[in-house]
Amino acid sequence: MKISIFILLLFISSMVIISVNAETETIQTNTACDCDDDCDDGNRWSTDMCSAGLLFGKYCTHTQICCDDENACTIDSCSKTSGCVHTPINVDDKNPCTIDSCIKGFISHTQISCDDKNACTIDSCDCSSGCQNKPMSCDDNNPCTVDSCNNSTGCRNTPISVDDNNPCTIDSCSKSTGVVHIPINVDDLNPCTIDACTKEGGVTHTPVNVDDNNKCTTDSCSLFTGITHTEICCDDNNACTDDSCSPSTGCVNTPISCDDKNPCTVDSCNNSTGCCYTPINVDDNNPCTIDACTKSTGVTHTPINVDDNNQCTTDSCTKEGGVTHTPVNTDDNNPCTVDSCSPFTGVSHTPINVDDNNKCTIDACTKEGGVTHTPVNTDDNNACTLDSCSPLTGVTHTPINCDDKKACTVDSCSNSTGCVNTPISCDDNNPCTVDTCDDSTGCCNTPINVDDNNPCTVDACTKSTGVTHTPVNVDDNNKCTIDACTKEGGVTHTPVNTDDNNACTLDNCSPLTGVTHTPINCDDKKACTVDSCSNSTGCVNTPISCDDNNPCTVDSCDDITGCCNTPINVDDNNPCTVDACTKSTGVTHTPVNVDDNNKCTIDACTKEGGVTHTPVNTDDNNACTLDSCSPSTGVSHTPINCDDSNPCTVDSCSNSTGCVNTPVNVDDNNPCTVDACTKSTGVTHTPVNVDDNNKCTIDACTKEGGVTHTPVNTDDNNACTIDSCSPSTGISHTPINCDDKKACTVDSCSNSTGCVNTPISCDDNNPCTVDSCDDLTGCCNTPINVDDNNPCTIDACTKSTGVTHTPVNVDDNNKCTIDTCTKEGGVTHTPVNTDDNNACTLDSCSPSTGVSHTPINCDDNNKCTVDSCSNSTGCVNTPINCDDSNPCTVDSCNNSTGCVNTPVNVDDNNPCTVDACTKSTGVTHTPVNVDDNNKCTIDACTKEGGVTHTPVNTDDNNACTIDACTKEGGVTHTPVNTDDNNACTLDSCSPSTGVSHTPINCDDSNPCTVDSCSNSTGCCNTPINVDDNNPCTVDSCTKPTGVTHTPVNVDDNNKCTIDACTKEGGVTHTPVNTDDNNACTLDSCSPSTGISHAPINCDDSNPCTIDSCNNSTGCCNTPINVDDNNPCTVDSCTKSGGVTHTPVNVDDNNKCTTDACTKEGGVTHTPISCDDNNACTIDSCSNSTGCVNTPISCDDRNPCTVDTCTKEKGCQHSPIDTDDSNKCTIDACSSTTGVTHTSINCDDNNACTFDSCSNSTGCVSTPISCDDKNPCTLDSCDKKTGCCNTPINVDDNDKCTTDSCTKEGGVTHTPISCDDNNACTTDSCSKSTGCVNKPISCDDSNPCTVDSCSNSTGCCNTPINVDDNNPCTTDSCTKSGGVTHTPVNVDDNNKCTTDSCTKEGGITHTPISCDDNNPCTLDSCSPTTGCVNKPMNVDDNDACTTDTCNKDGTITHTPINTDDNNKCTLDACSPKTGVTHTPINCDDGNKCTINSCSPSVGCISTPVSCPKPKDKCSISQCDSAKGCIEVPMNCTSDKCNEASCCDGVCTSKPISCPKPKNKCQVAKCDLIKGCTVSNVVCDDGNACTEDSCCSDTGKCQFEPIKLPKNKNKCIISKCDPIKGTITNSTVNCECDDLCNIGECCEDTGKCNYRQKDCDDNNPKTADSCDSKTGKCINKPYNVITSGSNLISGLIGGLIGGGTGGKGDCKTCKN
């Protein structure tokens, strides 16, 4: 048992030893030993050691080294001789096609590579023989390729060259048809070209020949309308041509014929108006002919009839002097005959009757001495007696009665001058009164009525101006009203109409500036809109188009910066694509090349994992392919051929059913193409024919809008054309016809306003014609009628002098006649008045020697008279007294029989009296009743004019009356009320100066009062007039202070005036300027409240505008922003509906999109997913039907790829390696051409470089030179277009030069010619606008001409035709009066005819009947006077009887009444000479009277009216001896004024009182005392100042009174300026911040402030003070807060609750 345990222990021990070192093999033997040498076993590959045993003793151990090479593919052993041995294991599988190996213990048999690096062999390995390299076949069964093989790249199927060098074919090749050469479509869809193609010239588009060989058409061709032949306009704008057109020669402008077959006109033609028929000048410059022209006779010069039907003239006419009517010489040189001439009977020499049957004259006549009547001398040298001589009674000296019973005269008699009835003067020198004198009551000065019953005048009358009717000032100083005044409505202020019917203006009106039409600001501040304004609708903000036709940009618009074409983000976040975008292709995501050149791997790339090379699964589960894989060619799935040779199908193969030929989707979603597909042409997208065969529409088609036919704009902005459009011919601009068919206008057309019919001028510059114009015939220059119906003038007219009326020569060479001529009586030769006012001479006259005065013989051979002669009265043959005391008889004495008492003739031949005679009253001539019951007229009657009713002059020139007149009350001169209700004045009125109130003397010896009288109590001591001539002071005077001048209160309590006062202008209340320069307020002013700026109402009642106002421009109605920032709504606004947000229509009628709209993303058309999770189908969608999953054909017909398809991956096309190591080629492989090494395009898109290529470095771009050595170009280079030799801008911005540049001369600026060869324009040139051909004005301001203009000759002022075809009018036209049709003078100067005129019969002269049914007349008719009912001769040759014929034809001879009721004559009658009324002599020898005689009272001596003196400061007086003299005017004044006369007015100039030496005294003047001195009063109204005056300067000084000084400067003493009392107050140191405690420092008077102490001595609180309440706030800190908050809290506590220190007191009440 013990042994067993021992053995077990040994085993365990040995196991422990062995296991201690696993890397060595240690063998312990039972050989005992003492040292290592005892244990050598002779094996050098072991370590021999002597070591202690496990339990007891020492034993030898042999440790074998380790031979493990850590290679599982070797058998490791150790040989005593050689050591470690590592024997490879046997891996050979006996297969030549594998390489056998062992790696880390794993045996592998790797298939060897049989790749011979020849792409033209199919490499494989045979299990028996090893590698095999068989040549491969490259035939692709494609007639379009040349098949070959390249050892490095493999099969090459190079596309054959299909180019037949014919530009007229499209060369192509297809698998089914082979090479084809299809003729190209040369049609450019332009009807204006002939499209063709030739091998030599290629495609040509030759312009068609549009010429129709017709010169009457403009031939053209338009892309839209094709060839058109538009008729040309042959109108040469010449009214003198007939315009037509000949197809062979073109326009024909044949001159028209203007011959009117009238010899009386000059026929011409005006280019602008047409035929012009100017009357010829028929004037032969001979005043002795009547020049005329008629159509039948032509021009005639008929001698005028010079006979004036006056036998007293010799009538003749000479070319030089014209018509003369020379008076015949009637003088027979015999003073004893009266030589006369009657126009009807001729010259007569009637013996004069020298017998005056007057015993008071001696009558005689001798050829030498003529007739003499020597008067008797009746003068007793007493002007107060009436000295007379009666042929019957002789000389009498009757005292005259000078009483005229009139209150208006002062009656007297002067022995020297006789009666003086001096009219009193009632003239009050007041134009506002009617000054009259009533014979019973005296002077009357009635105020005139100034009221003109017109509310639009201020009616007044002043002494200086008289009656004035001043128009009222209707101007309310408001330019927004039309101010007017009408008699009916008075003053009106009608608001102006500010609306200019233009929605583009803001219409407003300012009272100061008037109506304004401020253009509204349509700028919406958006760069994305074109802002404009429509006059009818207002602002239009049209969005601009930002489409740059670049698919690589997102086109948008920013309202601030404008169009933004942001490059799109092409990154699809897919590592498997190369992302790019070009303008031609748009965004492309080109797959990355994942090819690892191992065609048996699926080289792929996923968005998540990137590029992967997964071994291919050659099984495509597709019955349509043969699946295989070759390392060189890869997996092949050879498709079955499903090509049906139909380009209209997508040929594919269904995994389950076989070939699928799906019709292609030809819809390109473009409404502008007709999409189709045919077997011959394939898919075509033919542009739709948009032509609607309507030349009036612009036909177009856009992808968005489809076909549109937009009407063309026919407006050529020319008012002279009618713009229209014909669907067949297109737009036409037909010139409008401006011909008004009037020869009197020049017809033209203005492009801006349309027809202009300008009147022509017919002025022939001949004053002897009436120039007019007839709309049919043109100018008419009718000779004027020069006859002024005045026999005293010779009437003529010449071109140089015009119409002249030369006075006739009336001298008959007879000194005994006064030769005159009157319009009524013609030439008269009135016998001169031979009377020398000496009654004692016989006054006569000899035609040759003139008047003579021969002393008369006063013996009247009449026993009834005593004969004598008085120088004043002549012969005095004092009648015997035959008075029978019957006033109704003329008492006379018959030279032979004695007294004769003949009944008086009461008829005074005065239509103004009713004549009668009674014994009691005598002869009465009762004035007719002229009263028209209107007391405002002076009803009168004169012998000549009969009854008249003259409006009275109510002005009595009396300032003391109010003059007026009423129909009922007549003229009234109401005395003015002179009573001033002041008993202390003497009230009076002077007719010249007006009312005066003379004060009584109430002098109280007080220099400060004007002593006057109280109305009720007597004397009143009124303050003197202290007026310092300063309207700005209230002047007063008090006894203690003297005169004071207190400034006036200018305040008119009207807040609308600036109240001021100046010495010159006085108090003024200037209207304030209410304009606040703010167009947004209506500025006005109320007297009570002042200026107000009421905001104007800018509400335009349009919910679509934000109504605001701009201070400078006024109302601004800005369109509101209707954008709700929601792209899902169409935002708009209308006046009626306001803002609307209509949901957008998101339906794009596309079943392939999910249409939606969100506020964030806008409208989206999210394509629906048609993915069937089968990568082998083309998942598409038809817009009309929805998803289509068409099996794809993976045949890309690309020899460069191996095509496969899996449900998961889809088609796989592995690219071949095309690199030829040439940097000048793009190595590629094309499905049609195979691998190509296309020369790279080194075009850097920079036309400014010469691009080339280096095989080693690639493209080289060398800059080109663009210098063309031409000074007229700016040489530059444009990257896009290349050299740009841009003509320099030679424009000098002067449109008056032609700017050019030549290679030789450089830039030139040649002045242009603005001559338009049109005489009707003023040609000039404007730098800014160019030629200005301004039409000249042909207006001659003559209504008698049609003013026109001829392009060649200029202005044509053609006389208008004034003929109204009425023989009863004289038709004429004058510059001032225009056309007049004056009734013709039908008077044939034959008063024996009734002259008339009718339009039908013309002038007729019907004989009148002169039968007066009176047996006492011989009835006849005189052409000059008319009916003559000549009384039969009943004359008994007794001049003292009235011979009459009675109604029954019997004749009676009644004695005449010699009394002419004229006290100024001595009345007598001689049977031979008849009644005589010898004037009496009334001369009183007084130069201050005008001696005259009144028929009713006799002699009158009227005071002379002396003329106003030349010196207005003199007055006229009359001296009886000298007559009128001038004496200075007497002007009086008071003691303060110096009186003088200035310009006829007494003026008083204030005297200048001497200035006192003391400047604190002022000089003043007392009206009674004169100059006095008073002290200056200095009172500033402040009781706290001491007022004084500085005697040096005279200026007031106002020194503040001295306030008591306080030791405590915190006490302030103040003075009350009104009461003058002194009060003390303390400085207020209180603050608005109640945490500041203020105290006043007594030493300085200044406030010191300290912060209120709120420290509660608690470190755990933040101490502060509330400034509003003054209360302390002790807020515990928040100890949980962060450190920063704690610090800020502590700082806040320290700041807020600090103690002491000066607080911040920003606002103190002090």
Curated annotation (Swiss-Prot):
Induction cue: Induced by the putative stalk-specific morphogen DIF (differentiation inducing factor).
Protein's name in the database: Extracellular matrix protein A
Ranges annotated as spanning the membrane: none
GO CC, alphabetical: extracellular matrix; extracellular region
Pfam families linked to this entry: Dicty_CTDC
GO biological process entries: culmination involved in sorocarp development; extracellular matrix organization; response to catechin; socially cooperative development
InterPro entries in alphabetical order: ECM-enzyme_regulator, S_mold_repeat
Glycosylation sites: 150-151, 270-271, 415, 535, 655, 751, 871, 894-895, 1015, 1110-1111, 1183, 1255, 1351, 1530, 1624
Keyword Calcium part of the UniProt annotation: no
GO molecular function: structural molecule activity
The Cys-rich CT repeat ranges on this chain: 43-70, 71-94, 95-117, 118-141, 142-165, 166-189, 190-213, 214-237, 238-261, 262-285, 286-309, 310-333, 334-357, 358-381, 382-405, 406-429, 430-453, 454-477, 478-501, 502-525, 526-549, 550-573, 574-597, 598-621, 622-645, 646-669, 670-693, 694-717, 718-741, 742-765, 766-789, 790-813, 814-837, 838-861, 862-885, 886-909, 910-933, 934-957, 958-981, 982-1005, 1006-1029, 1030-1053, 1054-1077, 1078-1101, 1102-1125, 1126-1149, 1150-1173, 1174-1197, 1198-1221, 1222-1245, 1246-1269, 1270-1293, 1294-1317, 1318-1341, 1342-1365, 1366-1389, 1390-1413, 1414-1437, 1438-1461, 1462-1485, 1486-1509, 1511-1534, 1558-1581, 1582-1606, 1608-1632, 1658-1682
Signal peptide: 1-22
Sorted UniProt keywords: Glycoprotein, Repeat, Secreted, Signal
Top-level taxon of origin: Eukaryota
Localization (cell): Secreted
Keyword Signal: yes
